[in-house]
From Swiss-Prot:
One Gene Ontology molecular-function label: magnesium ion binding
Keyword Metal-binding: yes
A GO biological-process term: green leaf volatile biosynthetic process
Tissue: Expressed at low levels in stems, leaves, roots and fruits.
Protein name, entry field: Terpene synthase 2
Record flagged with keyword Oxidoreductase: no
Cofactor note: Binds 3 Mg(2+) or Mn(2+) ions per subunit.
Pathway this chain belongs to: Secondary metabolite biosynthesis; terpenoid biosynthesis
Recorded catalytic activity of this chain's protein: (2E,6E)-farnesyl diphosphate = delta-cadinene + diphosphate; (2E,6E)-farnesyl diphosphate = alpha-cadinene + diphosphate; (2E,6E)-farnesyl diphosphate + H2O = (-)-delta-cadinol + diphosphate
Amino acid sequence: MDAVSCAINALSAQAPPKHLGGNNVGRKSVTFPKDIWGDYFLKISPNEEKLDSWRVRAKELKEKVFDILSCAKGAEQVHIIDALYHLGVSYQFEKEIEEALKNMLTTYNDDTSTEDDLYTLALRFRLLRQNGFHASTKALNKFKDAHGSFREDLASDVMGLLSLYEASYAGTVDDLILDEALAFTKIHLKAALPHLDSHLAQRVSHSLELPLHKRIQRLEAREFISLCEKDDSIVIKELLEFAKLDYNILQALHQWELKELTKWWKKLNLVGKMTFARDRMTEIYFYVSGFFFEPQYSRGRIISSKILAICSVVDDEYDVYGTLDELQVFTDAICRLDVAAMENLPEYVKPLYEAIFFSLKEFEEELAREGNAYRVNYLREEVKNLCKSYLQETKWLHQRYIPTLEEYLLVSEISSTYTVIFNGCFVGCGEIATKEVFEWFQAFPKLLSDSARIGRIADDIMSCKFEQSRGHCPSAVECCMEEHQCTKEVALGNLDGVLGRAWKDMNKACMRPTPFPMEVLRPIVNLARMAEISYQYEDGYTFSGGKTKERISMLYKDPIPV
């Protein structure tokens, strides 16, 4: 039995908690906003002639960008690599960037000169850290005064401040100087903001709202390309043209995937049969593609989106519709996952059980042709763990029990669906999805736990008001308030500290040497980034008509004019 299952079973087996109340929680009445995309992606037809011409031109430009990157040295090379990340095309030059960063690390850690300005040095540091290289913070000391504080004359170097601000989020718990850097840069960037030109003010405001380290690359690319179109001094012309074409070519692939998923979802008609549930196929794909956008992960995105769409209905079955007795029977059936187990289920929930059972069988049959059917067993176990975690949360609601924060997170990190998402994605991946990777996922390593923790707490902070109004198990906010007997404001401050620590621990876990390559680790961090994005303004999944709709339009609906 895996570590997650053992922990949930242990909690479930505990004697009833002290804070028992009435046990009469019945069905809840909740009306979720309707699906806003409908058949939109079914109707999209790519212009193959235009796509072919884009591919030909992109191939030519890629060679030119390769030459530019290969010839660049020193600070110029640093700026080009940074531009590749901002423009969303770094994945096209991974080997070249890796080699450049290895060389950069040697000169960075050995260099005691004062050649680099604040902007370039902080940028070197961030690029190295975000790729898992242990760049020292000692070089930043040259920007401090005799009293050990950052020099006040740096306040006039806005680009340098912005670069240091972004770099400060790549720190670990041991990097105290980066905490100082964050506080220093925040104060001076906010003070400078009213006096900046519109383009620079936009960049600074954007970063103060959500730092680059917490943004997803694909959205950043769209926004950065738009910024570069307004200011042609930011990047080289050929690089910008290549980024636009690459964006549109990849968008066409994502549109095709959404079309296939929409067809499948409409045919399944699960929400039509279980009308209490949220209908969010497009939003689920947005979430999944946020941490795995590259073309080689197409099948992984499709499989993960399918199982997550079904699990979203499972979530609503536990949260808003099923009675405790029904949910216990459903959980028992899921733990068996065979056709015979369906006989004892209420009629209304059988379509949901069938969707889980037959989708997993479908994945298994597809992967059997490659000799990888064993992967689906790991996904199957995580679906079982997910339902166990949902049931435990439902029991807490019925018992009127408020667990400690750590007790709550032990369960809710699983109910966040992160383990299902990752297993679903890697089930459909290529050679990087080894048995060792699945075993590592099943052990629920700290990196995955921290990512799930960020997702759960970000969700709870934004969602607790709506969820508590309809009857929901306690959120992280309520758990923290009860445990520490504090106000909501104090609890939110405590949780902000938990989030900050989780980010720093993830940064440390990605420092080389690592148990697996960055291709395995980076998506875990990206999922935490998706949580920051999704709950930045509201619960962008449940209420998807605002910023989420705007972002989906940017990513999958509207190509960049070229």
